[in-house]
Amino acid sequence: MPEPASAPTPTRRGRVPRTPRVLRILVPALLILVWLTAAGIGGPYFGRVDEVSSNDRTAYLPESAEATQVQALADDFSGSDALPALVVVTSEDEITEAELSALTDAGEELTSLEGVIDEVSPPIASEDSLAIQMFVPVDADADVGTVVEQLEQELATEVPEGLTVHVTGPAGFSADLAEAFAGIDGLLLAVALAAVLVILVIVYRSLLLPLIVLSTSLFALCAALLVIWHLAADGVLLLSGQTQGILFILVIGAATDYSLLYVSRYRDELRHRESSWAATVSALRGTVEPVLASGGTVIAGLLCLLLSDLKSNSTLGPVAAIGIAFAMLAALTFLPALLYAAGRVAFWPRRPRYDPASAQEPSSVTGRGVWGRVARAVSRRPRPLWVLTAVVLAVGCIGALSLDADGVPQSDLVLKSSSARDGQAALGEHFPAGVGSPVQVVVDEEDLQATADVLAEAEGIDSVSVTSADYPSGSAPVTAEGIQAQGPPGAPAPDPTVVGGKVQVQGTLADAPDSPAAEQTVRELRTALDQEGFEEIVGGVTATSIDTNDASAHDRALIIPVVLVVILMILMVLLRSILAPVLLVATTVLSFGTALGVAALVFEHLFDFPGADPAVPLYGFVFLVALGIDYNIFLMTRVREEALQRGTREGMVRGLAVTGGVITSAGVVLAATFAALAVIPILFLAQIAFIVAFGVLLDTFVVRTLLVPALTLDIGRAIWWPSRLWRAGGS
């Protein structure tokens, strides 16, 4: 344990109250023990997140959405909660009778697989005889990825040579998502931690200190995951793969940033104080306010997501807020305790030596180091500098106008090769592309025929059917003459399945269910059915996509202004000013616009992405504004502290010089952790990774280094208007 605290030297840095030796030993030991216990209990939950998470898009829609209401009735109409897997078999030549017989036998064998809960439909040949399709009912509560993998393996051995097999449909795409998210608790975490470790080793040129900082981030994540898992298990929160990935990255990045701030203060105090305890207390005093202000601002911004109609967004708010809270807590309790226990050895081989003279030396450091030179350069001609910087950033914003954020097809959500995507393409070549994912209309029984007529007249509908337990396939065809019978002439027509006076009419889409054409068809159907005066609800895969995208667009329009107002109010309280917060928020928004503009150009011309989810700009905004304002908070709280003693100009120059290194390191760490999201082959996460990583670097090296300091220097003491600091002449 470190040496006892000697009598504090009365210097400009202030006295540290004398603390009994027993407390100096007991408090750090207790803190370390508590965090070790939390990490020990929470660590195993990394492997159990799948138990309480779901990637079902319907589950995240509001209960008022039509697609949600239709999904809630699906089990009642079908008699099971099966998720359809669509087997598509193609051939370059016409499929022979022998091959068709072999496929029939293969389909019958599939019923014995675990997770297949009903009879597999017989093979249905395409008109050109170059493909067949079979419907396999998969238990929605089973591990869909495993079931689909077993289907592919079984078919690979049973299907005759020369035939190509794909498993697509809702089950196939669900399996793709499950496989893509499988690397979240392994690959993503490993890449993020490795990136942070490399950066910390470069920053500190030490072996032990980076491990201490990294352990702080990991312990914070373990504790946060422990709490979140139990909240999700109790149904308080809904977790998805993307929420889990963002949580991991956010906690590691934020905890490391806060740790960097504390370590910088602590190392400085060790040079001025002989006692490690006095240095710890003094470092905490200087770190608590900016960390709490920064973390509190991020939490407030994230909690604005609670206003979202989508549960995927409203859940991310509290999940991420819990993560940030534990990141702050770990950086302000576990890290100081661990560093105090390790003493100056933690910085080996560059241990900070106690230098009594340094405590009495003048406080101006602007003449030393890279950031001292940067601060002086900015102070020479601030007005031309901030004008030029603002113009360049504004030009970058223009690209945001070309961002296509109206949603992407389900088949493009996964970036890697996909059997489900290939199967969907093959399906569209030989069958109506919407087979297996029809539009579903729940309507009063007496309106069945009229509803079927509206669907049949729609240009994008290939055929119409009604759910019927009496029909072998479960859906009986409906034409202008009514429900069609199966069997010899004169056979009676089957009765539709009626649930609470309602029937389910299905329309097979002519286009792929995740295509813009299919979405347009469903929107037109909703309008046409409403005009007929039916009391109907329209659901299905396409309707789910429409309702999700519409809710996302609504959230974007509502939440972004609320986040701005909340952060602005927090900054006004923190800086006791009106003008400074307005300028800080404006510069951060400008930075976000530039990041979004550059991202739009990169996505379209470099990566050739098909578009973006409507939630991408919202997530990018919340993370960049909430996290980007962090660095301005770190900078301006120090500037205000210095301005109280030296005036605004000298305070700005000194504040930039003193905080430049640590804030830059924090920005690089946060950018690296968010960039790690790109290792998960999900389009949404890859786009968020680029926008946030690029935006954070832009904020770190341009906005916080050039734009904000130059603006502050040009405006002068008026930046603090209408606070007492402004009335006192800036000092």
Predicted feature residues:
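Short stretches within intrinsically disordered, low-complexity N-terminal or propeptide regions
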Residues: A7-T9, V87, Q133
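Short, charged low-complexity linear motifs
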Residues: N55-R57, I184
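N-terminal extramembrane/targeting module of integral membrane proteins
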Residues: T37, R57-L61, A67, S91-E94, ...
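Membrane-embedded transmembrane helical bundles of large multi-pass transporters/channels
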Residues: M1-D50, V116, D139-A405, G533, ...
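Structured non-transmembrane domains adjacent to transmembrane bundles in polytopic membrane proteins
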Residues: S54, E63-A85, E92-S174, S402-G611, ...
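Charged, low-complexity surface segments at secondary-structure and domain boundaries
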Residues: T58, S358-E361, Q410-D412
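Short coil/turn segments at secondary-structure boundaries
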Residues: L86-V87, L388-V391, V439
